Amino acid sequence: MAWFFAPEPVMVTADEALKGGRHPVLENPAPHTVLGTPVTGPWKEGQQRIWIGLGCFWGVEQMYWQMDGVEGTSVGYAGGFTPNPTYREVCSGRTGHTEIVEVVYDPSKISLEQLVARGLEAHDPTQGFRQGNDVGTQYRSAYYTENEEDAARVKAVVDAYGETLKQHGFGEITTEIGVISPSDYFLAEDYHQQYLDKNPDGYCPHHSTGIPCGVEA
């Protein structure tokens, strides 16, 4: 019997990436179906945001909109090269993007560290370009912020969790941490937005390591 294994995903380069579209795939998004808040703002004074990738974005968005202090979520693509990509293009692995949830939150009610920790606990950040059976560069673990100060705060939580995972026999964390502009985040198509509210029995995989992060609530 012959065994066949798919090649490991490889990150596309800027020169190899698809050119993308001239216009966003979702230009006038409807309000959030659960929270009722605008998907693209305007935001309230003091609200902050972070972009989080933990694998398939459907379940991740639901997890965050259920958290106290989170006042807006949407799903989209970031971290790559192709402007205004479609879902199909992202799934081809030729855009460099990962599936992302934008989380808008009130820092007086929930901290950046709590948001990061919840994400780390909800997936396996040591899996590289995959989460469970979802394989591809678009499923990589990632946290993107608007400034270096927030990125440093994210890194501190991720690094500490990495040490905890090592003590439990896991490998190195592969989570990508970076600073992006809001214009580097591209909304996904309408049917992806609040997908599990529209489709309660939809696909919602869980790939948690079961190891707590240890950030105080």
UniProtKB/Swiss-Prot annotation:
Which key words are in the record? Oxidoreductase
EC number of the protein: 1.8.4.11
Q: Which reaction does it catalyse?
A: L-methionyl-[protein] + [thioredoxin]-disulfide + H2O = L-methionyl-(S)-S-oxide-[protein] + [thioredoxin]-dithiol; [thioredoxin]-disulfide + L-methionine + H2O = L-methionine (S)-S-oxide + [thioredoxin]-dithiol
Which GO terms of the cellular component aspect does the record hold?
cytoplasm
Q: Where is the active site?
A: 56
- What would be an example GO MF term here? L-methionine-(S)-S-oxide reductase activity
Q: GO biological process: what's one of them?
A: cellular response to oxidative stress
Which Gene3D superfamilies does its entry note?
A: Peptide methionine sulphoxide reductase MsrA (3.30.1060.10)
Function according to Swiss-Prot or TrEMBL: Has an important function as a repair enzyme for proteins that have been inactivated by oxidation. Catalyzes the reversible oxidation-reduction of methionine sulfoxide in proteins to methionine.
Q: What does the similarity note say?
A: Belongs to the MsrA Met sulfoxide reductase family.
Designated name of the protein: Peptide methionine sulfoxide reductase MsrA
Its taxonomic placement starts with: Bacteria, Bacillati, Actinomycetota, Actinomycetes, Mycobacteriales
UniProt lists the gene as msrA
